[in-house]
Amino acid sequence: MFEINTSAVGDSLGLTALVAILPLIAFFIMLLGVKARAHTSGAVALAVSLIIAIVGFSMPVDMALSSAVRGGLFGLLPIVWVIITAIWFYEITVASGRFEDLRKTFDLLGDGDIRIQAILIAFCFGGLLEALAGFGAPVAITATMIMALGVKPLRAATVVLIANTAPVAFGAVGIPVTTAGEVAGRSADQTHDIAALISLQVLLIAAIVPFLIAFILDGFRGVKETAPAAAVIGISFALAQWLAATFFAYQLTNVIACIVSLGCAFAFLRVWKPKGVKELRERLELPAAESTTDLNGRRIWMALLPYAVVTVVFAVATAAPAIFGFLKLHFAWPLLDDAIVDADGNLMDTSFSFNVFGNPGTLLLLSGIIVAVVYHFFNENGRYNLSFGQPVSAFGDVVSRMKFSALTIILVLALAYTMNYSGQTIAIGEFVSSAGGIFALFAPVLGWIGTAVTGSDTSANALFGNLQVAAAERISVNPDLMLAANTAGGVVGKMISPQSLAIAATAVNMEGKESVILKNVVGYSVAFLAFVCVIVFLMTNVLGFLVP
């Protein structure tokens, strides 16, 4: 039996917390100081954590190693599995040629106004990509699409980075939320509560992002001339995101929010047209808008089909879990089962569970197969030819491209579980909670820092999720609120992460000028962070009625 001792080093909580935070410091030094690759940084941090667990916290060697393997397996199943299938799902649309029709659909909706087109592409479609792929895909893809509209590189990069905020928390089919709940040992219902709280914390950010996109592209004139459409898109997205995260399946939050906002935009733009479109194109020296006369209802529907399919598949899995939930793996973890007692004297749950057919990754695989079959047989007389071999080849390509990213995720989760099970995270949590209720004001900063450094809200939750819970319990605040705060902080930190900046710079042909892009977006990031901090703090008292 291993008992967690938060004063294991020198019989001092402060000294123990200082030693416990060394793995995180090592991770950030390797990543930012040494400029090592993320998986190398994760490996070094894991090694430091294992040494501290064994030497500093007196955890048996076999239990420490088993903790790391337990975390690594969760990193693989379901996180890496979900990411691989999500990216593969998107690649099917590209291989089929239908993706080009989707791009033209946005041109048709925007009626030649690049400000509205940019909102639809970067915010709505980018949100769909974030829902299915995440991990930089929305930034890379939407940046090139906006550049194709004639927008200058720096503005295009700024637009897509700021647009990639509100959807981040529910990216890759809700993996950041799932990770937050898993590493902190929350139940399925509690994890759903976390999702609902996140949607409230980022509600206003989601609503104002379309206005910011218009401002970046055309200043206050752009905001004035597109305000009605920006309001419809932003408010419909924010409300749909909240409703989906609160009352439906949080894994589909982004898909639903994006489809709803696109639908509202389509309906609204049929009765309202933006002003100053011709003058805008002349003022910004833009080329003539691309013709969309060859588009028809059938082609538009087929371009949108993948997102309808994934919505239906996930809806069925949620409404009738028995259909996909007949094969669930659940077993006690070797060496750890009933063997770890936390700081409060309670046994920690270390069991492993995996729903083979009902997890988001397998559901995405099924959705992709359905889409591939439909695209194969309904190919417009060969115009959109998709052979059965192409999806198979694309899957292999995705696995190959993902190998280092997958290794990073596995190592970061191994680090998180080692820190959690050995007591390192709890020691840090107890120490920071000594700040009292004011800690709630700064809780989102941890998620902001974690995401800014790692480039992933999922990784930030893996690193700091249990710490947030430990701190919340010490100051008698709802742990789910602090987990949500960590995720919401990560949402606004994504735009300044080196990973996101590098992807944006590459997409707009500004390689080596990441610092220029950073200067353009860092102010927005800090302002958003301050707003989230205030909202979270108010939810611990004045707005406490919003917390489940």
Annotate each language-model stretch with its function.
Residues 94-99, 111, 146-156, 182-191, ...:
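Juxtamembrane helix-boundary/capping and inter-helix hinge elements in multi-pass membrane proteins
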Residues 114-127, 153-166, 190-210, 408-411, ...:
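Alpha-helical transmembrane segments of multi-pass membrane proteins
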Residues 169-284, 488-548:
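Juxtamembrane and boundary regions of transmembrane helices in multi-pass small-molecule transporters
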